[in-house]
């Protein structure tokens, strides 16, 4: 295991193009610091889901917003925080999917991304403070 920086911090707009650029840069950064592949993959998949949700559902089409991403390395886990100025929404309150055993045509639309985050992370948290959604998830380093 390499020596990790204390924090990676970035701000993107609610534009899908910015999301793709951010994820590419993040992948390179996680490679540079030699984060284990399984951990880096979990961070990237969860961030892709959380940021995609914020961009797709958090803003009316005409509103430009800012989404902050903070990745903090602790002793045995990584804490990822996604903070946006979009509409109030707690993605983690949705019930777990009961329809995973059904054929794709019979499943309810939505919720699979958050289901993935909940299963890859050791814990998740949402807060609403000063007109901002603060969503956090924890990824174990081992």
Task: Indicate where each model-derived feature is located.
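Short beta-strand-loop-beta element adjacent to the nucleotide/active-site pocket used for signaling
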Residues: 72-80
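Glycine-rich/acidic phosphate-handling loop/turn and adjacent ATP-lid/helix
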Residues: 81-109
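A conserved short beta-strand within the histidine kinase catalytic ATPase domain
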Residues: 65-72
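Short helix-loop "hinge" at the ATP-lid/N-box region of the Bergerat-fold HATPase_c
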Residues: 54-59
